[in-house]
């Protein structure tokens, strides 16, 4: 059985070990590639300050690239009795290279090592989320343009209110995800700062070159203060979780709209048949299960910042084992959101709209404001026009054509989709993922 990195002469109680390790080995498999990348940058820096020879560096880099390849293929495992990914990587190096493998931990603690792994993992996941959101955005904008002339009822208080359009409906969610991307971008910028070299949270007496590892790993800058670098554990995850929750909030609302509009009482849209399921007793049913599950998953994701906050709440500065538990709720959240984005993008691309909703006279009163505005434009004081139309409605005399003439920015007749698309493009460019990708390729020799 492998010796633990921290092991002394005291016998380990197996029940206590099981309790303290928990799901950490399972979660650490997500971090394996990133642990290797971090180690490659660290040992390159160690060689530059004389703690490794050039020959040792060459051997270590070659073996680390082999380990990375196994992780990339899904073949990397954390062996029984090995408590985390850091221990497994060091064990593999030591088995293959002997004492050289034992040198890679110089100037490093598992505290800054796991923080680095999490940041490398998280920024990669943020990139994938951003790409998925951008795909959804393009579908929404395209559908907004496609159906820009198709009117639908707008609601307030779930009461029919004013004319809207499918152009506005699709476009509203398109602009919403642009704002969501701003939160994601802010989270990325906070994440993309290098904690390596903070060690256990108080630095090292080794002359570490933290600027070098920052460059090698493609970070924007450092977490300069070593105490803050460790204090950022939990805070970084919470900030990212808030960005994920913001995106999830938009998708949840969209899913609710679509489920409601798909029901027979509304009949505004028709969801793809392959995204609905039947009933075991009612042969006519087509239940919007995919969007119902999407809504539930997104609502769960919206609780994630609170979960992380409660785990890290009331901790003083320094490292505490409490922080390990955050991984269990944080790491799986990315795939859950990506799944929801994939389903939503597919459904919104395939959804069919009812182009004749307003043929039903029950929607006639949504044009009451149009009539008030017409009278006001002709010179009648607005309040008098409002009263007249109200009396006509009460007397059953109200009538109005089923057309609208809105021209101001963001209205039915002027959706501003080009301007919204420009905002999205500007936001996407603001991430600047190129630096991290090029840095990791350079370390891997690709």
Give a label for each model feature.
Residues 217-305:
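Acidic, glycine-rich loop-and-beta core segments that form the ion-binding/anion-interacting portion
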Residues 119, 123-130, 134, 141, ...:
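Short amphipathic alpha-helical segments with heptad-repeat character
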Residues 44, 48, 69-76, 94, ...:
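Charged/polar positions within long, soluble alpha-helices
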Residues 2-38, 99-100, 267, 282-446:
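Glycine-rich cofactor/substrate-binding loops
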Residues 2-203, 208-214, 221, 277-278, ...:
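A helix-coil-helix interface module used to build multimeric assemblies
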Residues 105, 110-113, 157-164, 168, ...:
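Alpha-helix capping and helix-loop boundary segments enriched in small/acidic/polar residues
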Residues 60-61, 217, 262, 273-275, ...:
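A general structural motif at alpha-helix termini
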Residues 62-70, 231-234, 391-396:
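A short structural micro-motif
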